[in-house]
Amino acid sequence: MSLTRDDVLNQAKREIMEISIEELKARLDQGSPLFLLDVRGREEVEQGYIEGAVHVPRGFLELNIEQVVQDRSTPMIVYCAGGVRSALAAKTLQEMGYTDIVSMAGGFNDWRDAGFPVARPEPENHGTERKTAELESEIEQLRRQLEEKERELTSLKKR
């Protein structure tokens, strides 16, 4: 029998712990040591994130998490936009041996809508996206190479 999306999500939610946005806010206000993991996409993160979060997109979680969090007993709270991807990510992290994983119910959207603090600059990124400055530098280098090739072609045509 095939599972539906809801079946998979409900199964994950039965196997993980969840925290409300209010509980997370209280823990952050108390200075509780925890690791915030944002598993949303880059475009979502650019709209804001919870201060202190580290960004590892859900699609790259299994590939990158061991480089980001080596200690599998690190208390970690995972969040996404609405609580679906974070629940699935929490289940995956548990399967990978991480022992203190909690998913934030309601996700970032509920956090923002409650008026809780939202940071704007992008958090540290451990996905596959390249930094803008690197891309701009590469584009400039390619532009110079193209100009050189155009000069060579013009020179050859004049002969």
Spans of features found by a protein language model:
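Short, surface-exposed ligand- or partner-binding patches at beta-edge/loop junctions that are enriched
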Residues: 78-80
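Rhodanese-like catalytic fold shared by cysteine-dependent sulfurtransferases
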Residues: 1-35, 42-75, 84-159
